[in-house]
Protein backbone atom coordinates (compact mmCIF):
# COMPACT_ATOMS: atom_id res chain seq x y z
CA UNK A 1 0.00 0.00 0.00
CA UNK A 2 1.40 3.42 -0.96
CA UNK A 3 2.10 6.12 1.62
CA UNK A 4 -0.61 8.41 0.18
CA UNK A 5 -3.15 5.57 0.18
CA UNK A 6 -2.30 4.69 3.78
CA UNK A 7 -2.71 8.33 4.80
CA UNK A 8 -6.08 8.44 3.07
CA UNK A 9 -7.20 5.36 5.01
CA UNK A 10 -6.22 7.06 8.29
CA UNK A 11 -8.23 10.14 7.39
CA UNK A 12 -11.24 8.02 6.44
CA UNK A 13 -11.12 6.24 9.81
CA UNK A 14 -11.25 9.68 11.43
CA UNK A 15 -14.26 10.53 9.24
CA UNK A 16 -16.11 7.46 10.52
CA UNK A 17 -15.37 8.41 14.13
CA UNK A 18 -16.60 11.97 13.60
CA UNK A 19 -19.74 10.78 11.82
CA UNK A 20 -20.56 8.37 14.66
CA UNK A 21 -20.18 11.00 17.38
CA UNK A 22 -22.06 13.71 15.45
CA UNK A 23 -20.65 16.55 17.49
CA UNK A 24 -20.08 20.23 16.90
CA UNK A 25 -18.77 23.14 18.93
CA UNK A 26 -20.37 26.58 18.80
CA UNK A 27 -17.89 29.47 18.68
CA UNK A 28 -19.37 32.84 19.68
CA UNK A 29 -16.49 34.81 21.23
CA UNK A 30 -13.20 36.25 20.02
CA UNK A 31 -11.36 34.35 22.75
CA UNK A 32 -12.70 31.00 21.53
CA UNK A 33 -12.08 31.98 17.90
CA UNK A 34 -8.47 32.85 18.65
CA UNK A 35 -7.88 29.47 20.30
CA UNK A 36 -9.58 27.65 17.43
CA UNK A 37 -7.53 29.58 14.90
CA UNK A 38 -4.31 28.35 16.51
CA UNK A 39 -5.55 24.77 16.26
CA UNK A 40 -6.74 25.04 12.66
CA UNK A 41 -3.50 26.63 11.49
CA UNK A 42 -1.84 23.28 12.25
CA UNK A 43 -4.17 21.27 10.00
CA UNK A 44 -3.32 20.22 6.42
CA UNK A 45 -6.91 20.87 5.31
CA UNK A 46 -10.33 21.86 6.63
CA UNK A 47 -13.81 21.74 5.12
CA UNK A 48 -15.59 25.10 5.01
CA UNK A 49 -19.11 26.31 4.29
CA UNK A 50 -21.03 29.52 4.98
CA UNK A 51 -24.53 30.70 5.67
CA UNK A 52 -25.26 34.30 4.74
CA UNK A 53 -27.87 36.85 3.78
CA UNK A 54 -27.46 38.77 0.55
CA UNK A 55 -28.43 42.39 1.19
CA UNK A 56 -28.06 43.64 -2.39
CA UNK A 57 -26.93 42.11 -5.66
CA UNK A 58 -23.27 42.78 -4.85
CA UNK A 59 -23.28 42.73 -1.05
CA UNK A 60 -23.91 40.10 1.59
CA UNK A 61 -23.60 39.55 5.33
CA UNK A 62 -21.93 36.41 6.62
CA UNK A 63 -24.09 34.79 9.31
CA UNK A 64 -22.32 31.51 10.10
CA UNK A 65 -19.01 29.89 9.21
CA UNK A 66 -18.87 26.09 9.40
CA UNK A 67 -15.56 24.25 9.74
CA UNK A 68 -14.74 20.52 9.81
CA UNK A 69 -11.17 19.57 10.72
CA UNK A 70 -11.86 15.81 10.98
CA UNK A 71 -11.73 15.93 14.77
CA UNK A 72 -14.77 18.12 15.22
CA UNK A 73 -17.20 20.41 13.43
CA UNK A 74 -17.15 24.05 14.49
CA UNK A 75 -19.92 26.58 13.93
CA UNK A 76 -18.55 30.12 14.14
CA UNK A 77 -21.20 32.76 14.84
CA UNK A 78 -20.17 35.66 12.62
CA UNK A 79 -23.16 37.74 13.71
CA UNK A 80 -22.02 37.79 17.33
CA UNK A 81 -18.36 37.99 16.22
CA UNK A 82 -18.91 40.75 13.69
CA UNK A 83 -15.21 41.69 13.56
CA UNK A 84 -12.80 38.71 13.61
CA UNK A 85 -9.77 40.97 14.27
CA UNK A 86 -7.32 38.67 12.48
CA UNK A 87 -8.39 35.74 14.64
CA UNK A 88 -9.12 33.40 11.71
CA UNK A 89 -6.02 33.67 9.54
CA UNK A 90 -6.11 29.91 8.89
CA UNK A 91 -8.49 30.90 6.08
CA UNK A 92 -5.67 32.86 4.43
CA UNK A 93 -2.83 30.42 5.08
CA UNK A 94 -1.03 28.80 2.15
CA UNK A 95 -0.39 25.71 4.29
CA UNK A 96 -4.06 24.94 5.04
CA UNK A 97 -6.25 23.75 2.15
CA UNK A 98 -9.83 25.05 2.45
CA UNK A 99 -12.37 22.63 0.96
CA UNK A 100 -15.65 24.05 -0.37
CA UNK A 101 -18.51 22.96 -2.58
CA UNK A 102 -19.43 25.62 -5.16
CA UNK A 103 -17.21 28.19 -3.52
CA UNK A 104 -18.09 31.41 -5.37
CA UNK A 105 -20.58 32.81 -2.86
CA UNK A 106 -18.59 31.41 0.07
CA UNK A 107 -15.55 33.37 -1.13
CA UNK A 108 -17.65 36.53 -1.31
CA UNK A 109 -19.21 35.90 2.11
CA UNK A 110 -15.85 35.40 3.85
CA UNK A 111 -14.50 38.50 2.13
CA UNK A 112 -17.50 40.51 3.38
CA UNK A 113 -16.61 39.50 6.95
CA UNK A 114 -12.82 39.78 6.90
CA UNK A 115 -11.91 42.00 3.95
CA UNK A 116 -9.22 39.47 3.06
CA UNK A 117 -8.67 37.10 0.15
CA UNK A 118 -8.60 33.35 0.82
CA UNK A 119 -5.89 31.21 -0.76
CA UNK A 120 -5.25 27.48 -1.26
CA UNK A 121 -8.81 26.42 -2.05
CA UNK A 122 -10.36 23.18 -3.28
CA UNK A 123 -13.87 23.05 -4.75
CA UNK A 124 -15.61 19.66 -4.89
CA UNK A 125 -18.14 20.91 -7.45
CA UNK A 126 -15.38 22.15 -9.74
CA UNK A 127 -13.41 18.92 -9.25
CA UNK A 128 -16.47 16.92 -10.28
CA UNK A 129 -16.73 19.02 -13.44
CA UNK A 130 -13.18 18.14 -14.44
CA UNK A 131 -13.53 14.48 -13.48
CA UNK A 132 -17.01 13.55 -14.71
CA UNK A 133 -18.33 16.55 -16.64
CA UNK A 134 -21.00 17.40 -14.03
CA UNK A 135 -20.79 21.19 -14.15
CA UNK A 136 -23.32 22.24 -11.52
CA UNK A 137 -24.05 19.25 -9.28
CA UNK A 138 -25.21 20.28 -5.81
CA UNK A 139 -23.65 19.19 -2.54
CA UNK A 140 -26.57 16.95 -1.62
CA UNK A 141 -26.56 15.37 -5.07
CA UNK A 142 -22.82 14.72 -4.99
CA UNK A 143 -22.94 13.19 -1.50
CA UNK A 144 -25.83 10.95 -2.57
CA UNK A 145 -24.08 9.90 -5.80
CA UNK A 146 -20.63 9.26 -4.34
CA UNK A 147 -21.37 8.20 -0.76
CA UNK A 148 -24.96 6.97 -0.92
CA UNK A 149 -25.97 9.30 1.92
CA UNK A 150 -29.00 11.61 1.94
CA UNK A 151 -28.27 15.08 3.33
CA UNK A 152 -31.07 17.17 4.84
CA UNK A 153 -32.05 20.26 2.79
CA UNK A 154 -34.77 21.52 5.14
CA UNK A 155 -33.12 24.75 6.32
CA UNK A 156 -31.74 25.96 2.98
CA UNK A 157 -33.80 29.16 3.00
CA UNK A 158 -33.73 29.85 6.74
CA UNK A 159 -33.18 33.27 8.28
CA UNK A 160 -29.55 32.85 9.30
CA UNK A 161 -29.24 36.35 10.80
CA UNK A 162 -31.89 35.93 13.50
CA UNK A 163 -30.61 34.74 16.87
CA UNK A 164 -30.76 32.30 18.52
CA UNK A 165 -30.43 29.76 15.73
CA UNK A 166 -32.63 26.69 16.11
CA UNK A 167 -31.32 23.17 16.71
CA UNK A 168 -32.55 22.29 13.23
CA UNK A 169 -30.51 25.12 11.70
CA UNK A 170 -27.39 24.16 13.65
CA UNK A 171 -27.62 20.49 12.66
CA UNK A 172 -28.24 21.44 9.03
CA UNK A 173 -25.23 23.78 9.05
CA UNK A 174 -23.01 21.08 10.54
CA UNK A 175 -24.11 18.57 7.89
CA UNK A 176 -22.97 20.94 5.14
CA UNK A 177 -19.32 20.26 6.03
CA UNK A 178 -19.71 16.70 7.31
CA UNK A 179 -18.85 14.94 4.03
CA UNK A 180 -16.63 17.44 2.20
CA UNK A 181 -13.32 15.97 3.35
CA UNK A 182 -14.27 12.47 2.23
CA UNK A 183 -15.19 13.83 -1.21
CA UNK A 184 -11.97 15.87 -1.32
CA UNK A 185 -9.70 12.91 -0.56
CA UNK A 186 -11.15 10.84 -3.40
CA UNK A 187 -11.35 13.72 -5.88
CA UNK A 188 -7.85 15.04 -5.31
CA UNK A 189 -6.42 11.56 -5.83
CA UNK A 190 -8.40 11.22 -9.08
CA UNK A 191 -7.35 14.68 -10.29
CA UNK A 192 -3.69 13.85 -9.69
CA UNK A 193 -3.98 10.51 -11.47
CA UNK A 194 -5.67 12.16 -14.48
CA UNK A 195 -3.24 15.11 -14.53
CA UNK A 196 -6.11 17.58 -13.99
CA UNK A 197 -5.28 19.01 -10.58
CA UNK A 198 -3.45 21.95 -12.17
CA UNK A 199 -6.56 22.76 -14.23
CA UNK A 200 -8.66 22.79 -11.05
CA UNK A 201 -6.21 25.07 -9.25
CA UNK A 202 -5.93 27.47 -12.20
CA UNK A 203 -9.70 27.71 -12.46
CA UNK A 204 -10.06 28.66 -8.80
CA UNK A 205 -7.43 31.38 -9.17
CA UNK A 206 -9.36 32.68 -12.18
CA UNK A 207 -12.62 32.67 -10.21
CA UNK A 208 -11.05 34.47 -7.24
CA UNK A 209 -9.60 37.15 -9.50
CA UNK A 210 -13.08 37.85 -10.90
CA UNK A 211 -14.57 38.19 -7.44
CA UNK A 212 -11.88 40.37 -5.91
CA UNK A 213 -11.06 42.61 -8.88
CA UNK A 214 -12.76 46.01 -8.38
CA UNK A 215 -12.79 46.56 -12.15
CA UNK A 216 -14.81 43.46 -13.05
CA UNK A 217 -18.56 43.16 -12.59
CA UNK A 218 -19.42 39.91 -10.83
CA UNK A 219 -21.81 37.83 -12.91
CA UNK A 220 -24.34 36.28 -10.55
CA UNK A 221 -24.81 33.33 -12.90
CA UNK A 222 -21.08 32.51 -13.01
CA UNK A 223 -20.39 29.07 -11.62
CA UNK A 224 -16.62 29.35 -11.86
CA UNK A 225 -16.44 26.73 -14.58
CA UNK A 226 -15.52 28.81 -17.62
CA UNK A 227 -12.19 27.14 -18.27
CA UNK A 228 -13.57 23.71 -17.54
CA UNK A 229 -16.22 24.27 -20.18
CA UNK A 230 -13.61 25.55 -22.62
CA UNK A 231 -11.79 22.24 -22.24
CA UNK A 232 -15.05 20.43 -23.15
CA UNK A 233 -14.68 18.01 -20.31
Question: Language-model segments: which ranges?
Answer:
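N-terminal accessory regions of nucleic-acid-interacting proteins
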Residues: 17-46, 50
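Active-site-proximal helix-loop-helix substrate-binding element of RNase H-like nuclease domains
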Residues: 66, 71-86, 90-181, 187-188, ...
